[in-house]
């Protein structure tokens, strides 16, 4: 029985990657397209003046983007994690691994995650567990990678579509609070592509969580992945569940939104999406599906070159936004249009204030 469970988990990991890569073959429209930064025609800064450094979970990092959680737990995904770690090392960005549940249940799979630390010994690495994982096991996940932080992924929609998924969730909040109290490293609670409302973030803040990853709809769709894995595909009506990255970011502009550090991810396509997310308060921006798609299509070296180009493009966008650093970018005026404006209005967001921040 244990062997069958292990094989099922390994197969699921491989299917997640294959289906996720397929989803990212074409860039979909994004809610971030409804955001327009108000720039300048007479910049105060030169490109060389721009400071892209940021702070996430108390750690200073040189760039405001990172490789988000995606994979690990099978022989195939070990090679992917090794390649992602090389990219993270060469570009000097943090990275997260996918859920480590497989390795916690089967120690022979630990190396599919530990390869990340082997390839990137001095990098910033985030471990990853579900709130289903007991705290003592979550601490093992941290030790497994000598991790700098721990992501706890919350994914009720994915679990419900997954035939073998969890069906009990009421204990999650207490488990997260226990992690906050006992973890030797910072905790990041993240969605997996269904977004967080300010109410969800407030609930997490009340149990001591200091950083969340909003992880909105628009990138890798795990409801679709799990539905595609089902023979009956019985949950096709749930494929549009959740709120987008743009909606999550706009929701955090509400006057009653909790004071908390937040990261943005979900459907990030280019440097402009990163800048818009930072302007709406994110401290850094995560990418998973697009990075793995680029890795599969173009290889490690070309993906590194692409992200190195993004660094220069980000500096240019900061110049156009008349912002020397992320703190100034967060004060840049921006217009919210279209369906995203409709969302903001009915959620009580002061969009006029956002359009006249400086």
UniProtKB/Swiss-Prot annotation:
Residues that bind substrate: 12-13, 158
GO MF terms, alphabetically ordered: FMN binding; isopentenyl-diphosphate delta-isomerase activity; magnesium ion binding; NADPH binding; oxidoreductase activity
Top enzyme category: isomerase
Binding site for Mg(2+): 159
Parts forming coiled coils: none
Cofactor(s) essential for the protein: FMN; NADPH; Mg(2+)
Subcellular location: Cytoplasm
InterPro entries per the UniProt record, alphabetical: Aldolase_TIM, FMN-dep_DH, IPdP_isomerase
BP GO terms, sorted: isoprenoid biosynthetic process
SUPFAM superfamilies, per database record: FMN-linked oxidoreductases
GO cellular component: cytoplasm
Catalysed reactions, as listed in the record: isopentenyl diphosphate = dimethylallyl diphosphate
EC number(s) recorded for this UniProt protein: 5.3.3.2
Keywords: Cytoplasm, Flavoprotein, FMN, Isomerase, Isoprene biosynthesis, Magnesium, Metal-binding, NADP
Binding site for FMN: 69-71, 99, 128, 190, 220, 267-269, 288-289
Highest rank taxon of the organism: Bacteria
Family of the protein in this entry: Belongs to the IPP isomerase type 2 family.
Family matches, as HAMAP family: Idi_2
Function description: Involved in the biosynthesis of isoprenoids. Catalyzes the 1,3-allylic rearrangement of the homoallylic substrate isopentenyl (IPP) to its allylic isomer, dimethylallyl diphosphate (DMAPP).
Subunit note: Homooctamer. Dimer of tetramers.
Protein name, per record: Isopentenyl-diphosphate delta-isomerase
Species for this entry: Listeria welshimeri serovar 6b (strain ATCC 35897 / DSM 20650 / CCUG 15529 / CIP 8149 / NCTC 11857 / SLCC 5334 / V8)
Gene (UniProt): fni
